[in-house]
């Protein structure tokens, strides 16, 4: 148990993307999980990479758990920070993912310089694995979210995760995978949409300190992303 002062300021880590930082009142909030969801190729991984580089430029170490096949070439193209501050775990299964989350939690306990944990993407293996035991999958889902929430709160660092989407068969809307279980654990949720002109719109759909519905536009570029009106 920790005693918390209400006068303690909110810690925020800049993402390195000006319009997104403005949207979030200064950056990713410490102590909580922020979820970014959107269709494939919408820019979720780009935001994760740039946010990681921004944290490192602020003197913080980053743990990055990758299930998407992070491109080293792309990472080095967008990152001009000291990559010795970057710890990458590539995971290949749901069990791998849980082990990586536990390792990240222990590392954050030992090293005060760790300032961000990224998981891209959280739902990849939950979506792909075919298990007959639905309750066991739900329990694992909850356990991993609990571990991430705990390390974020204890160390007052942002945890950034990405999520896949699915189409609701009843109304055709695109929703983040995991439904209520994921939504309940998130204190901040951002949706990225592709625009017909190639730009991306990022919208706050849930946040404990930012008005829902506010949005910004950006475009993916060779060396990162650029904000656009």
Curated annotation (Swiss-Prot):
Similarity remark: Belongs to the eukaryotic RecA-like protein family. RadB subfamily.
Superkingdom of this protein's organism: Archaea
Residue ranges the record marks as coiled coil: none
Pfam family membership, one: Rad51
Keyword vocabulary terms for this entry: ATP-binding, DNA damage, DNA recombination, DNA-binding, Nucleotide-binding
Name of the featured protein: DNA repair and recombination protein RadB
Residues holding ATP: 38-45
Covalent S-S links between cysteines: none
Classification via InterPro entries: DNA_recomb/repair_Rad51_C (IPR013632), DNA_repair_and_recomb_RadB (IPR011939), P-loop_NTPase (IPR027417), RecA_ATP-bd (IPR020588)
Organism whose genome encodes this protein: Thermoplasma acidophilum (strain ATCC 25905 / DSM 1728 / JCM 9062 / NBRC 15155 / AMRC-C165)
GO term, biological process aspect, one: DNA repair
PROSITE patterns in the record: RECA_2 (PS50162)
UniProt GO molecular function: ATP binding; ATP-dependent DNA damage sensor activity; damaged DNA binding
Stored Gene3D superfamilies: P-loop containing nucleotide triphosphate hydrolases
Keyword Nucleotide-binding tagged: yes
Function: Involved in DNA repair and in homologous recombination. May regulate the cleavage reactions of the branch-structured DNA. Has a very weak ATPase activity that is not stimulated by DNA. Binds DNA but does not promote DNA strands exchange.
